[in-house]
Structure formats: C-alpha cells, structure tokens
C-alpha cells in the first residue's frame, strides 16, 4: 500500500511552488470533464487517455465528484463512487496524484424543501428543472436555475458539514492516499460565478437579502446609519431590497455610477463579492480542517479578463480577500475565450492577474480546453485545425502560465466531440495523437526542469487594475435570444471596459514589451523600481491616499505614468471630469461624441479605435504639441505632459494596438524584445514566440544575447532566454 501523499504550496526562489511529498513538482496536469461519457476514470476512453498522459510523464490528474453523488437522501455518506473515481486514475497510473473537484451543490430536493435559501433573480423567476437522462448537472447554471444561495447560512452549514465528512472519510481510505488536492466548486460551472449572471441579475433571494441587511447594519452602524448613507431618511432595514435591474443598468456620468446617489447599488455589489469570497475561504478552510495531512486547497477564483461585460454581476471583485487568506493555496481559471486570445495567433493568456497571485504566494492553474484537430470542438462544428497548429497552440497555452510562475491542466472535452473516423474509431480524446502526446511530454520535462530553480520575470511595464472599480460601473444583462455559446457578447451600457481589460492585455502580449500586472490594493507595498512604464487601467475610483501614493511613489524616477479612459474620475465621494482634473494635471471634460472614434498618431505609429455607439468620452485641453490622439471631430483624446519627476499620459480610449504600446514603451525606456505584432512571452528563463506569419526575427531578451532567427509560420518557438539556445522549435 502506498504512503499517503502530502502536498503544499510554498514560496521558494521567487515563486509559489507545488511540493508533492516535499519535492518541487511542475503543476502540469491532465483532467477529465464532468461530461457524461467522459467523466468516470475507470471507463475505457477516459482510462486510455489517463494512461497516455502517464506514459509521457504526467503524474498529476484531476476528476470531478459531487456531494450529491456521495450522500443518500437521509444524508448518510457513501464514498464508493469517489473511491472508484480515484482508483480508476491510479489503475492507469499507479503513482498518480489526484486533484478532486468537489461540487458543493445541494440536491434539487434540498432546494425544494428550502426555497427561501435559494438564489433569486431581479428580472425573472427561478426556473425549476427536470433532469432527464445523462445530463451535465451544471449545464443550466447560467439560465435562471434553482440553486442554493451563496449567502444562505443553512446551505453553508450543509456544505461544510458534508464536505468535512467527505474529506475526513476519503482521506482514511487507500484511495485517499493518492489525493493531493481538493478543489472546492460551486456557482456557474463550479467557477464561483453568480448563477444566471449572463442574462439575469442575481442574487435577490430571501437569504441574500437577509444577509445584505446584516452586512449593511455592520458597515454603517445600524439602521440609522444605513438611512444616512443612502440619503433616505426614515429607511428601515426591513425595507431594504436588492437593487432591481434598472438600477444596476443606470450610470450617472458615461459608464460611472454616482457614489452618493447610487450608494445602494455600490453597497450591494460590495456585499455580493465580499460574501462570495468569504464562502470560498470558508469551504477551503473546511478542507484544511478535515483532511488529516497537508493537502492543497484549490478553487476557481480571480477571474478578471473575458467576463463578457458582467464583472460586477458574476466576476470575482474581492480577489484580494481570497489572496490574503491562508486557507486557499491555489487559484484556477478557465481560459480567455476572446477572438484575440483563443485561436492560433492569439495570446492564450490567463483570466487572472497573475502578478498579484504570484506575489500573494498562491499557485495559479490555467485550464487548457482549446479543441484540437483530433476530434474537433463539441460547441463549434465549424472548428478546424491541423496537428502542427495544435502543437503550436498547446505550447503557447501551457507555457503562458509557466512563464508567469504557474501551471495548467489539459481539460478533455474531446471525448464528447464525436469520432473523426466512424468506420475505424469511437470517442477519442483531444490529445490522443502521438505528436501531441510527445509534445506534452516535452513541455512537462521543460517545466519540471525549472520547478526548483529561481524564478524571475524581467518586466518593466506594470499594469494596475482594480476589480472593485466594476462595482462603480453600470452593467447590463445580455439578451438570451442574442446569445450564442462560444461567441463573445458586448455590453449594452458599457462599451469601454472590454477595451481596458481584454484589449489592453491582448495588445500588450503582442507588443514585444514584457509586462506584469497588479491590484490597486497592492499599491502601498509594491516595489516600482523595475518599472519604466506604469499603466492605470481599470482604476476609475482613486481615493485621496491612493492619489498621494501615485504622485509620490509611482510618478517618480523619470517613470512614465499612463491614465486610461476614466482613471481617477471618482474619489468615492464625487464623480466627473473635474475630479480627474484636480489630481491628474490634465484639463479634462466629458465629451458627448456622436462618433466616438479615436485616432492615435505618434512616433510613426497610427491606431484608430472606436466605440459602436455615441458615448460620453474623456477629452482634454492641452497645447497641440502634447496631443497624440484626437476624436473624430478633432477634440484631443490623448495627451501627455512632462513633470519634474515623471511623464504623464492620458488616453480617452486605451491603446489596443501592439504598435502603440511599443511606441509608448520606447518613450519610457522599456526594452522591446520583439518588433513584430505576435505573442511574445518571457519568464522562468524562457523566451516564447508564437507567430502566424513567421519569418526573420531579431529578438532581444533582457540579460541575454541578441537572437537572430527565422521562425516557421504557424509556430511556437521556445528559447533559453539567457543563451538564445532553441529549446523547442
């Protein structure tokens, strides 16, 4: 009988390091999905794919189990299915280490008995479901499902009790000896999004509203304090309700809420996200308390990019709260699905702010669920690829998190995508092909060879984001009839934020600059000395202390400071261009642009970027020599000024072109590693270039030699950054 696995995440040599039995281990994994026909480890197709990955060095595997599957109607625990799930993996790979994703959903019968403990929706009634056949139990999560509320004390107690019993019981079995991590899962697709958040406005159920009232009373010092803060004399807590959809979709200035008049909406989103984070921490803590030996506690969390304009409705604004908790070791996320990130030639970057995660000492795991040519894509029948393209994408997607100090799992929907050759084959996994398996083995060996080495990433560009800013921005439900799975929807009330998040990230990744990212809440502790260019992106709300820190610590040492869109337009008490002007040094106004199209032009670069509707946008008054961009009607949209200690820039719309960022970087004295518009990654001693066009390149990694090379078209090439040696071509 094998000795029980012990696992932890520890800060070693500049990175959060996964330790399995005390040994640094590259966190690259293979994962089964929850899809019927592909979810049970002992069945022939999943077992084959587990064995294939094991043959190529993989020892870390992931699979799902639901509390509902291990409890009988009276709540008695039966671990048979969970043990069999782990045993199937161990049968295919005897020295496997297993991460179990434990879904904390209460059974439908529980929800029917406790309707007041379930989520509610401001715009629609919850929709009871009737299960039929082998359904994915999470398939209706983004409708308006009947689900226990995150804020229900009764559900929290139910989940903690049964999760604790599950962990203690499984850990005592022979199969439990192979488990190195428990990933707690709930919310849409287990990813801790509010149920129904795409097209509905959660959570307005009785449990959530009762918790909101308690939270408000604590925040504002009782009922009278709430009435004062909301400027509603005589308001009682009993009268407090969650905001309706109209209130959530309303803005005061452009996309910004009034922090006084709309305080009730801002308060509600603050409550939703603090309570959500506290629930994740609580469940991870239950695992920690119940598992009798060191185990990695994991959770989907920290989603920032690719949130479809629904950041406040269903994102993770309180990520700093989770990062500060010792109960959570590992944050995970599905990939960015935007057209600029997902396909060949895209960036393949993570949904989270990985710099902040790494500095907090948490391990980050990406999900790699990009389809391959082996069996196609179950949600996109028009998908096409080739094995060489599959190799290029696999390399890019697995090395993206590796170069940022994290890891990934390959999430295999291929088994439910159909058979590529009906007369010869049945269901087949996405990576069940010799060249793809060999490539995974090479990537794993590359990552494992670095697992115990010092980590470094020579970034000289820093992008600062504040997830909490989205509590101050209007957001709108998507229209169900317009939704197509796999197609990115756009917001009806906020056309700018996607340019500040996805647009900035994608263009920076393809600029040849090396950037890191940070949370605004990290401002007091950050070391700014490595950075020549600091970008304030989603920072609409900056209080007096933050403005002082920016003026004193960021705008110093000749650094260039870039303000994007509505940065600093609110101080938490007032909102508008005059608030921004008072601290930025730029004469600023709200410009009601009938055609909100910006043309940037400087240092040989030109970029045209526009909104799809008339909108109120920032405009500036400054000497013509300091104007680098104009709106369609000629009003200045992008300006700069030189101060004694720093150079300041302001953009009405953020640059979304790699060339614009390169020009800014050169102005600031940043190193440009690659002059071409293609995904260029640097970190952990690796330089990675992902290209569609290919051709001759001159690459300049910091601290390394100038590399002159001819890249193949549609390829991902990996270099040793310090020597220029080609590691994978």
Locations of regions flagged by a protein language model:
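Hydrophobic faces of well-ordered beta-strands that scaffold small-molecule active sites
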Residues: 26-32, 61-63, 98-102, 180-184, ...
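A conserved amphipathic helix/loop scaffold
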Residues: 390, 537-729
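Aromatic-lined substrate-binding rim segments of carbohydrate-active enzymes
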Residues: 43-132, 167-171, 280-291, 541
């Amino acid at each position: 009988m094998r000795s029980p696995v012990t696992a932890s995440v520890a800060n070693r040599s500049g990175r959060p390091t996964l330790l399995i039995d005390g040994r640094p281990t590259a966190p690259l994994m293979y994962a089964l999905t929850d899809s019927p026909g592909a979810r049970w480890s002992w069945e022939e197709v999943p077992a084959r794919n587990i064995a294939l990955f094991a043959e190529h060095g993989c020892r870390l595997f992931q699979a799902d189990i639901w509390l509902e599957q291990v409890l009988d109607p009276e709540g008695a625990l039966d671990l048979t299915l969970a043990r069999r799930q782990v045993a199937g993996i161990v049968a295919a790979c005897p020295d496997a280490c297993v991460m179990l994703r434990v879904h904390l959903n209460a059974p439908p019968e529980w929800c029917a008995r406790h309707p007041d403990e379930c989520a509610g929706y401001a715009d629609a009634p919850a929709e009871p479901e009737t299960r039929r056949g082998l359904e994915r139990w999470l398939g209706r999560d983004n409708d308006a499902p009947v689900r226990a509320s995150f804020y229900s004390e009764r559900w929290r107690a139910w989940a903690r009790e049964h999760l604790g019993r599950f962990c203690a019981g499984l850990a005592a079995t022979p199969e439990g000896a192979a488990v190195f991590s428990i990933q707690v899962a709930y919310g849409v697709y287990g990813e801790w999004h509010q149920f129904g958040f795409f097209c509905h406005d959660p959570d307005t159920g009785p449990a959530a509203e009762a918790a909101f009232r308690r939270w408000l009373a604590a925040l504002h010092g009782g009922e009278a304090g709430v009435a004062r803060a909301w400027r509603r004399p005589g308001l009682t807590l009993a009268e407090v309700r969650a905001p309706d959809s109209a209130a959530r979709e309303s803005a005061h200035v452009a996309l910004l809420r009034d922090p006084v008049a709309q305080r009730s909406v801002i308060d509600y989103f603050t409550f939703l996200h603090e309570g959500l984070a506290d629930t994740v921490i609580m469940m991870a803590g239950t695992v920690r308390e119940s598992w009798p030996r060191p185990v990695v506690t994991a959770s989907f969390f920290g989603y920032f990019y690719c949130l479809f304009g629904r950041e406040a409705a269903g994102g993770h604004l309180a990520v700093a709260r989770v990062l500060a908790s010792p109960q959570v070791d590992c944050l995970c996320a599905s990939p960015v699905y935007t057209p600029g990130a997902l396909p060949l030639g895209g960036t393949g970057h993570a949904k989270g702010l990985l710099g902040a995660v790494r500095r907090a000492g948490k391990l980050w795991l990406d999900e790699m669920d990009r389809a391959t040519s082996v069996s196609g894509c179950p949600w996109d029948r028009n998908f096409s690829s080739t094995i060489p393209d599959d190799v290029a994408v696999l390399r890019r997607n697995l090395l993206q998190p590796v170069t940022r100090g994290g890891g990934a799992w390959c999430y295999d929907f291929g088994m439910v995508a159909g058979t590529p050759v009906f007369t010869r084959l049945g269901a087949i996994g996405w990576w069940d092909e010799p060249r793809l398996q060999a490539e995974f083995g090479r990537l794993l060996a590359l990552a494992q060879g670095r697992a115990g080495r010092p980590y470094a990433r020579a970034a000289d560009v820093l992008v600062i984001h504040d997830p909490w800013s989205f509590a101050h921005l209007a957001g709108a439900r998507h229209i169900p009839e317009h939704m197509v799975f796999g197609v990115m929807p756009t917001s009806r009330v906020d056309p700018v934020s996607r340019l500040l998040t996805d647009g900035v990230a994608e263009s920076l990744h393809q600029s040849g600059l090396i950037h890191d990212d940070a949370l605004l809440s990290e401002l007091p502790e950050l070391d700014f000395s490595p950075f020549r260019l600091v970008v304030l992106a989603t920072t609409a709300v900056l209080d007096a202390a933050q403005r002082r820190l920016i003026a004193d610590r960021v705008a110093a040492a000749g650094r260039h400071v870039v303000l994007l869109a509505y940065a600093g337009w609110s101080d938490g008490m007032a909102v508008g261009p005059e608030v921004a002007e008072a601290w930025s040094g730029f004469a600023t106004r709200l410009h009601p642009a009938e055609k909100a199209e910006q043309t940037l032009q400087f240092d040989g670069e030109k970029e045209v970027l526009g909104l799809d509707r008339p909108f109120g946008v920032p405009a500036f008054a400054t000497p013509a020599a300091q104007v680098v961009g104009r709106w369609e009607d000629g009003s200045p949209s992008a300006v700069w000024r030189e101060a004694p200690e720093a150079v300041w820039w302001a953009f009405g719309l953020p640059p979304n072109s790699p060339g614009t960022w390169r020009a800014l970087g050169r102005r600031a004295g940043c190193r440009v590693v690659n002059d071409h518009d293609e995904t260029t990654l640097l970190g952990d001693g690796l330089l990675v270039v992902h290209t569609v066009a290919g051709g001759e390149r001159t690459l300049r990694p910091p601290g390394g030699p100038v590399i002159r090379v001819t890249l193949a078209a549609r390829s991902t090439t990996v270099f040793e950054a310090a020597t220029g040696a080609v590691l994978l071509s």
